[in-house]
């Protein structure tokens, strides 16, 4: 079988010439090769982002997801999002766009995934006291409004990150990073 043309091009790039935002072991390798290796190491964490307005935090969440080995991200609602904060890390993930919350919920139910929404609304469970299921999808809302009412109703559980200061909430990009790491602590590390 002939080599992937992208592999041939990237094979010519030396370690020092590769300025992409990838860890050292991926320097000089094609996007296809990197995605294949990451897919082979998939630990099962899936996330979803409600995208009702253009939120700069989505790029931050996608970048953190990549760092934590997330392979699948669902973007619910608008297809357009600010990719600048992702620092091109979205190229190494599988991003699937879903038109509505109802469509997303149906898809997750068909996959047998538990929907765990992350938000600090009344009735949410404390993260430190919650077991995050292995076969779950962590859902994050928009900065400001948080998860939608429809998502709150559909979620199997809503989990809040405990806070100890005076602010009403932490930034959704920071909250997503904390929640993904908690899932990893419970299911992988």
Regions found by a protein language model. Name each.
Residues 2-189:
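Post-transcriptional modification and biogenesis factors for structured RNAs
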């Amino acid at each position: 079988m002939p080599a992937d043309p992208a592999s041939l091009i990237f094979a010519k790039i030396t370690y020092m010439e590769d300025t992409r935002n990838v860890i050292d072991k991926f320097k000089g390798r094609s996007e296809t090769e990197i995605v294949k290796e990451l897919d082979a190491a998939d630990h099962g964490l899936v996330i979803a982002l409600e995208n009702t307005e253009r939120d700069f935090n989505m790029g931050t969440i996608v970048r953190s997801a990549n760092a934590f080995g997330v392979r699948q991200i669902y973007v619910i609602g608008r297809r357009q999002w600010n990719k600048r904060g992702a620092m091109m890390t979205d190229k190494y993930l599988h991003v699937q766009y879903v038109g509505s919350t109802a469509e997303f919920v149906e898809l997750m139910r068909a996959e047998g995934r538990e929907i765990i929404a992350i938000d600090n609304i009344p009735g949410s469970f404390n993260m430190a006291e919650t077991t995050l299921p292995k076969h779950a999808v962590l859902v994050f809302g928009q900065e400001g409004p948080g998860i939608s009412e429809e998502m709150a109703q559909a979620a199997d559980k809503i989990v809040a990150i405990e806070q100890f200061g005076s602010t009403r909430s932490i930034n959704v990009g920071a909250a997503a990073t904390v929640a993904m790491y908690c899932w990893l602590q419970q299911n992988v590390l």
